[in-house]
Structure formats: C-alpha cells, structure tokens
C-alpha cells in the first residue's frame, strides 16, 4: 500500500514542537483590525498549541498516523 500524502494546506499551517505537540496560529488577525482592541490583536499574534480533541485529526492530515 502506498504512503499517505500530507495535506498541503496543513503542512503550511501546523508545526511540530520538540515535545511532540502541534503548534498553530490564531485566526482573525489578518484584516478588519481597526475595531479590535490592542490587547485582542496582541493576544492573537502569538502562536498556541492544537487542542487535545483535534490532535488526532491534525496528525491524520499531516500523515503522521
């Protein structure tokens, strides 16, 4: 059976950390920023980890399963 292909959109959006967690960026930080507060925009610019409920789905997209 051939190898699973990695989803091209996923490999651009997710990254693995050294401990094996999956890193992602926040949404809602690309346009229509005038009505959003400085605090909200600042918090959206930091990256975070994928929630544990979605890890298996993301790993499947990244062909890690």
Curated annotation (Swiss-Prot):
Q: InterPro entries attached here?
A: Ribosomal_bL35, Ribosomal_bL35-like, Ribosomal_bL35_CS, Ribosomal_bL35_sf
Recorded GO cellular component terms are:
cytosolic large ribosomal subunit
Instruction: Look up the record and give one Gene Ontology term from the biological process aspect.
Output: translation
Regions of compositional bias (Basic residues) in chain numbering: 21-40
What are the disulphide bonds in this sequence? none
Give the molecular function GO annotations.
Answer: structural constituent of ribosome
Q: Where is this region: Disordered?
A: 1-40
What PROSITE patterns does the record tag this protein with?
RIBOSOMAL_L35
Task: State the UniProt keywords alphabetically.
Answer: Ribonucleoprotein, Ribosomal protein
| Entry's family note | Belongs to the bacterial ribosomal protein bL35 family.
Q: What is this protein called?
A: Large ribosomal subunit protein bL35
Give the source species: Bacteroides fragilis (strain ATCC 25285 / DSM 2151 / CCUG 4856 / JCM 11019 / LMG 10263 / NCTC 9343 / Onslow / VPI 2553 / EN-2)
